[in-house]
């Protein structure tokens, strides 16, 4: 059987697995084992355990449970409420000030958790009811939280960048630094759209009828101080060359756990157990997907499917920007149906040779890939953030939540276009801080 026929068969079976509802981790592993046995015989089984183990035998992977613990500790505390209230006291007089406060809180929270669902849930629980109380339209209130939550996988530390770095052997430190400016740019685009739509609709918040005193404003600063301390501590450890990403993640996890226990007084055994349980549950899920995705990638390589696809694309002699356009469309469609972790681990090893052959920077592409994953988080049918927000505000029709996210999807697409025209937005900072790198690390 030719590699093209084998590849078509693998594609069909994989798509059937994804739409069937089978957990991605188990589905990828089963498909990999089945096709290895089918085309290479039972002798191929001896590499399954070895490949599964080697997929997890990386010190870098320690960063994943550590960053997950950061999100679990902060998410279990009233930290999101404090952060949101502090920003609101300073920004409430601006047009759309409450939405801007939410987006700013999402950006800061993203720098603490690296998780989109955690960011969306923590800020949304306080932000959505308050925006609706002050008269903001439901589509703006829910759509802005959905979009702001996606910043959790772009603004470092980002679990998405860790997965991409592992899958493509790209420096995770460079990826983290590369996500800073695009993350701030995307936050700015979200804010600009919010101000524009509020101005166009002539909306006047109920908040205009009252004022916070300067005393109340300055009293809110200590609520933000612990977040800034943790962010600066982790970033200094990471970008100052003091620690590796895994070590910096450990520092961040310890600081967030101390914040939850000492400041927010989550010192009961049951409360700490819930944090550890959530950390273990999400970490095991991600690590299992990584291990089976490595096995899936081994199957693709051993059957020469990856090489055949790369050669077929190279034979097209397409313009590199047309190639990038097609890759973005492919990733966008994948994001509609497949969770981000699975997309990254399944597609990155296949796409990276194509990207580097076309002359694109793998770090820059990691940022482009992540923004595509952000779109998938607020677009049905997967659209995890949509369902989180709908659970927070169940009386808002799901269709209205979806319509509210569409302008922010356009903002993300615009961000991708801007990064294509000005790749230095993603590459300048890592090149400036770490020196110019060529290809994977």
Please place each PLM-identified region on the residue numbering:
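Alpha-helical transmembrane segments of multi-pass membrane transport proteins
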Residues: 1-441
């Amino acid at each position: 059987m030719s590699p093209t026929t084998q590849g078509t068969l693998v594609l069909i079976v994989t798509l059937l697995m994804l739409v069937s509802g089978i957990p991605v981790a188990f589905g990828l592993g089963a498909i990999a084992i089945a096709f290895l046995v089918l085309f290479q015989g039972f002798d191929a089984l001896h590499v399954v355990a070895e490949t599964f183990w080697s997929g997890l035998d990386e010190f870098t992977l320690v960063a994943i449970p550590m960053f997950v613990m950061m999100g679990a500790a902060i998410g279990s505390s009233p930290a999101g409420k404090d952060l949101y209230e502090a920003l609101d006291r300073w920004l409430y007089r601006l047009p759309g000030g409450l939405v801007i406060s939410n987006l700013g809180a999402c950006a800061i929270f993203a720098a603490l958790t690296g998780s989109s669902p955690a960011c969306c849930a923590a800020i949304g629980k306080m932000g959505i009811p308050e925006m609706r109380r002050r008269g903001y339209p439901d589509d703006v209130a829910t759509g802005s939280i959905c979009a702001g939550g996606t910043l959790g996988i772009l603004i470092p530390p980002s679990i998405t960048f860790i997965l991409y770095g592992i899958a493509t052997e790209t420096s995770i430190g460079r990826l983290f630094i590369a996500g800073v400016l695009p993350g701030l740019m995307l936050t700015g685009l979200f804010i600009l759209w919010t101000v524009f739509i509020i101005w166009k609709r002539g909306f006047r918040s109920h908040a205009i009828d009252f004022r916070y005193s300067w005393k109340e404003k300055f009293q809110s600063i200590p609520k933000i101080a612990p977040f800034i301390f943790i962010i600066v501590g982790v970033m200094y450890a990471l970008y100052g060359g003091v620690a590796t990403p895994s070590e910096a993640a450990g520092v961040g996890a310890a600081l967030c756990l101390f914040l939850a226990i000492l400041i927010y007084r989550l010192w009961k055994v049951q409360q700490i157990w819930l944090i550890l349980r959530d950390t273990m549950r999400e970490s095991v899920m991600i690590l299992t997907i990584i291990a089976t995705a490595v096995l899936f990638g081994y199957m693709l390589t051993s059957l020469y499917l990856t090489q055949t696809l790369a050669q077929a694309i190279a034979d097209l002699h397409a313009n590199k920007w047309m190639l990038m356009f097609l890759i973005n469309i492919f990733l966008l469609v994948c994001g509609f149906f497949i969770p981000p972790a699975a997309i990254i681990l399944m597609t990155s090893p296949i796409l990276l040779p194509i990207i580097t052959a076309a002359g694109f920077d793998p770090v820059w592409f990691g940022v482009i890939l992540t923004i595509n994953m952000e779109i998938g988080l607020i677009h049905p049918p997967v659209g995890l953030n949509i369902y989180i927000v709908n659970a927070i505000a169940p009386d808002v029709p799901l269709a209205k939540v979806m319509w509210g996210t569409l302008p922010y999807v356009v903002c993300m697409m615009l961000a991708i276009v801007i990064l294509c025209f000005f790749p230095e937005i993603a590459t300048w900072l890592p090149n400036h801080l770490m020196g110019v790198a060529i290809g994977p690390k």
